[in-house]
Regions:
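Surface-exposed, interaction-prone regions used to assemble/regulate multi-protein complexes
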Residues: 1-134
């Protein structure tokens, strides 16, 4: 399957550090960056190299064992190395230092999936059905 990368310039986010992970129960998964943020309301997985560390399904089906606190242990203070947006269905992959990847999979025809914003006015979000707005 061919996935087309967008030509959106994500340089504003490169080098930014994760400074907070939302751990509130019943709230969307999200994180604060040094000068921006990411809100996630779609399936996701956190991968270290070729190993899935934790994913959306883990938190839903085994909340006693898995939560956003597990994500915090991995991502807090990590810096962004790159961001990839695959245009077909607005999948967003965030590459962090040390071979860590946060992969977001938009899966709804009715709801938005994620929002990436920067304090400089950058605002990108996935739309219902798989497109995105920038």
């Amino acid at each position: 399957m061919y996935k087309k990368l967008s030509n959106i310039d994500f340089r504003y986010f490169i080098g930014q550090r994760v400074i907070e992970i939302n751990k509130e129960k019943n709230e969307p998964f999200g994180m604060a960056l040094e000068t921006g943020g990411l809100i996630i309301e779609c399936p996701w997985r956190l991968r270290i190299a070729n190993q899935i560390e934790i994913g959306y399904s883990d938190c839903i089906h085994s909340p006693g064992e898995f939560s956003h606190k597990n994500v915090e242990k991995v991502l807090l203070d990590k810096r962004i190395k790159n961001i990839f947006l695959f245009e077909e269905v607005s999948d967003l992959f965030v590459e962090f230092e040390n071979g860590i990847y946060l992969e977001l999979f938009h899966d709804s025809n009715y709801f938005e999936g994620w929002q990436l914003r920067g304090d400089d006015g950058f605002y990108l979000f996935s739309l219902p059905g798989g497109s995105y707005s920038y």
